[in-house]
């Protein structure tokens, strides 16, 4: 799909539920007219428009969320200070993902967090996970989101071992468009781009979740934040001013991880690369093989699935020191296209002023090529995760 073509959209038909009361800006109908205008500003294709319309129509029937209305189905994962479960919302019959965050905080702080999370109601994009609502109950904040049946890319990676470049092309497009939407339409940055915050589904959609919309929630969860710091940019780790350029570093680091099958710091040595790719892999301008890294493994990371990484675990401060002071990670030569290598290198420039920005990356050859490439993302995902593919086959939804 050409990036600049703006399709002519038929009017959105989102039916409000009779149970839905007037919003803060007036009647539900007036709110929907405003929403329709905002959606028509987005460059959506027909399929994206229909899916967003269907989600918003379903959401309009949900009404106020209450703890008693949910039936737990299974646990989806844990992280970022909360546990995510797959639930059914009994009044509507909808399947949702419910994130429970336990916080020992005063009522005023809790109410501020719930208020700040309401901004998520306005985040409607094919590249952002849908939001049903947030509420407080029994010492926990609940954030209810669209359920993505493919899970997160870190879960997909466990099954796939490595994710092919053409698939990562579609992932890169979705992440860039999601970041651009958050920045341009809501003036917010993500702050926590990593494989576990990129969700996918059997329809071929790729969406961002867990972005930093609530400053108060970020502050309240500061103590649980250490585990995500391995994706933070050098400037953020040093406590200096940071911007959306920091999200671009995190995306680049995530792409290297998804490409080679493990967190890329410290870099894999020649033996491990050979185990990963099944053949000797050379690197560097002179074509030298990867040298054996003297560095330990990063903290909390298992020994490589390829059995070659027997180094002791790296302490968290060693890892953060490495990110700030050592050369940035890169993709090995001879395995990936030059376009993809160059794209990743531009994301992982340590100086944020020299790092590529969103606009530059959207116009990069790797992205332009990936936009026109026919890739059956949904088919690949369903085969990898052994999911049932929806009856209507879809190409990558980006």
UniProtKB/Swiss-Prot annotation:
ATP binds at residues 76-84, 99. It catalyses: L-seryl-[protein] + ATP = O-phospho-L-seryl-[protein] + ADP + H(+); L-threonyl-[protein] + ATP = O-phospho-L-threonyl-[protein] + ADP + H(+); L-tyrosyl-[protein] + ATP = O-phospho-L-tyrosyl-[protein] + ADP + H(+). The modification Phosphoserine is found at residues 220, 224. The keyword Phosphoprotein applies. Keywords: ATP-binding, Kinase, Nucleotide-binding, Phosphoprotein, Serine/threonine-protein kinase, Transferase, Tyrosine-protein kinase. Pfam families: Pkinase. It comes from the Eukaryota. This is Dual specificity mitogen-activated protein kinase kinase 2.
């Amino acid at each position: 799909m050409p990036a600049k073509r703006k399709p002519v959209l038929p009017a959105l038909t989102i039916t409000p539920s009779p149970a839905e009361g007037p919003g803060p800006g007036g009647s539900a109908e007036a709110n929907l007219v405003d929403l329709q205008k905002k959606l028509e500003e987005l460059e959506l294709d027909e399929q994206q428009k229909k899916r967003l319309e269907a989600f918003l129509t379903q959401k309009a029937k949900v009404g106020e969320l209450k703890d008693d209305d949910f039936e737990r189905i299974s646990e989806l994962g844990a992280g970022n200070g909360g546990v995510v479960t797959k639930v059914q919302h009994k009044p509507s019959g909808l399947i949702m993902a419910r994130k429970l965050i336990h916080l020992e905080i005063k009522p005023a702080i809790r109410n501020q967090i719930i208020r700040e999370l309401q901004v998520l109601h306005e985040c409607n994009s094919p590249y952002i996970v849908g939001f049903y609502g947030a509420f407080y109950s029994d010492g926990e904040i609940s954030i209810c989101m669209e359920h993505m049946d493919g899970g997160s890319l870190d879960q997909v990676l466990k099954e796939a071992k490595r994710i092919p470049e053409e698939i990562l092309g579609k992932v890169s497009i979705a992440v860039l468009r999601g970041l651009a939407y958050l920045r341009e339409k809501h003036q917010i940055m993500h702050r926590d781009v990593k494989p576990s915050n990129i969700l996918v589904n059997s329809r071929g959609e790729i969406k961002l979740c867990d972005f930093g919309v609530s400053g108060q929630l970020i502050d309240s969860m500061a103590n649980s934040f250490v585990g995500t710091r391995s994706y933070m940019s050098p400037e953020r780790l040093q406590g200096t001013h940071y911007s959306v350029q920091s999200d671009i570093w995190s995306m680049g680091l995530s792409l290297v991880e998804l490409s080679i099958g493990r967190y890329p710091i410290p870099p894999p040595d020649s033996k491990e690369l050979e185990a990963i790719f099944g053949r000797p892999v050379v690197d560097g301008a002179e074509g030298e093989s990867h040298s054996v890294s003297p560095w330990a493994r990063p903290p909390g990371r298992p020994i490589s699935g390829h059995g070659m990484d027997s180094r002791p675990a790296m302490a968290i401060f060693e890892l953060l020191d490495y990110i700030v002071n050592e050369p940035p990670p890169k993709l090995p030569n001879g395995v990936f296209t030059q376009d993809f290598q160059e794209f990743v290198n531009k994301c992982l420039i340590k100086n944020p002023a020299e790092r590529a920005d969103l606009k530059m990356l959207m116009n990069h050859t790797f992205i332009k090529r990936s936009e026109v490439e026919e890739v059956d993302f949904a088919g690949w995902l369903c085969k990898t995760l052994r999911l049932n593919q929806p009856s209507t086959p879809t190409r990558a939804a980006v």
